[in-house]
């Protein structure tokens, strides 16, 4: 039987692994050309900044799902959150590896982003499982739109980053649909607007820091 202490310890372990350990993917990184494309310094800097933002998004996804898994009392729903977290863990590994390849660093504020997202996830879980799932749906839909915009902004020659972002976008859509199928309630419009504003702050800051 899983106790509250077990769940709390698992959440703490997940936070430490996300922030300080090298992430490992359970799936192979999306197919890229056998020979890496040479990017100009300008294109490399742009790709690095965009992939840093995407990496921050995956750090936050780990925090959100960990908090919601901790907060729910429904064992089936907890498994749903943990499964999604594992799939998002692939994204975390892919984006971190791509940052390394581009010679770019992760955001220096990752511990802050993680803490904020974990807090939001706990608040969402306290509102009830269906609203918590609604929070997942809206988060994933916003991330999906954000990734679509990155596909438009990434250099055409950066096939590696584009392949990763395209796969991530498809996965986010599946996570949103799965949450809807699990009984998600739609969030009020003001909450959606607040989430967009918070995401805008995060992406703007993470692009640079």
UniProtKB/Swiss-Prot annotation:
Q: Provide the cofactor list for this protein.
A: Fe cation
Per UniProt, the cofactor note for this protein states: Binds 2 iron ions per subunit.
Alphabetized InterPro entries for the sequence: COQ7_proteobact, Ferritin-like, Ferritin-like_SF, Ubq_synth_Coq7
Q: Which SUPFAM superfamilies has this protein been placed in?
A: Ferritin-like (SSF47240)
Reaction(s) catalysed by this chain's protein:
a 5-methoxy-2-methyl-3-(all-trans-polyprenyl)benzene-1,4-diol + AH2 + O2 = a 3-demethylubiquinol + A + H2O
Q: Name one GO cellular component term.
A: plasma membrane
Q: Return one Gene Ontology term, BP aspect.
A: ubiquinone biosynthetic process
Q: Give the pathway annotation.
A: Cofactor biosynthesis; ubiquinone biosynthesis
One MF term in the entry's GO annotations: metal ion binding
Q: What is its main location?
A: membrane
Which residues does UniProt call coiled coil? none
Q: Does the keyword Membrane apply?
A: yes
UniProt cross-references to CDD domains, sorted A to Z: DMQH
Q: How does it sit in the membrane?
A: Peripheral membrane protein
Binding sites annotated in the UniProt record for Fe cation 1:
58, 88, 91, 172
Tell me its EC number(s), please.
Answer: 1.14.99.60
Subcellular location per the Swiss-Prot or TrEMBL entry: Cell membrane
Which UniProt key words apply to this protein? Cell membrane, Iron, Membrane, Metal-binding, Monooxygenase, Oxidoreductase, Ubiquinone biosynthesis
Q: Which Pfam families match?
A: COQ7
Instruction: Specify whether Kinase is a keyword of the entry.
Output: no
Give a short account of what the protein does.
Answer: Catalyzes the hydroxylation of 2-nonaprenyl-3-methyl-6-methoxy-1,4-benzoquinol during ubiquinone biosynthesis.
Into which family does the record put it?
A: Belongs to the COQ7 family.
This protein is called 3-demethoxyubiquinol 3-hydroxylase
Recorded source organism is: Polaromonas naphthalenivorans (strain CJ2)
The gene designation is coq7
